[in-house]
Amino acid sequence: EPVIKIIDAITIEAIADSWIEIQDNNLEILVSKIIKKDSQINLPYKKDLILVTGNAGGIIIHIDNKVINNLGASGEVKRNISLNLENLIKFIDE
């Protein structure tokens, strides 16, 4: 029987000033702001959150004791990034 993982939070850390927007699966905007270098935001983990960022290379995502720091290049706009763990793990393996 598969083990159900309980993930309680997701943290987005800025290593450079980065605009981010996070929507839920109803397209409701939960966060839309610039996070300043060396700051972070913590969100309760919900399935099907979507991230848009204006600086993919400027953010690091922390989830389930994993670090995803290769979403894209500095200054690169990325849309529709699923924050589901199984999607983010693909970035770790690249």
Residue ranges with predicted function:
Residues 65-89:
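Contiguous beta-sheet cores, especially beta-hairpins with glycine/small-residue-rich turns
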Residues 1-24, 28, 82-94:
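Long, low-complexity, acidic/serine-threonine-proline-glutamine-glycine-rich intrinsically disordered tracts
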Residues 6-8, 31, 39, 74-79:
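Generic structural motif recognizing short loop/turn segments at the entrances and edges of beta-strands
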Residues 12-16, 20-45, 50-54, 59-63, ...:
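Structural recognition of beta-strand segments within beta-rich domains
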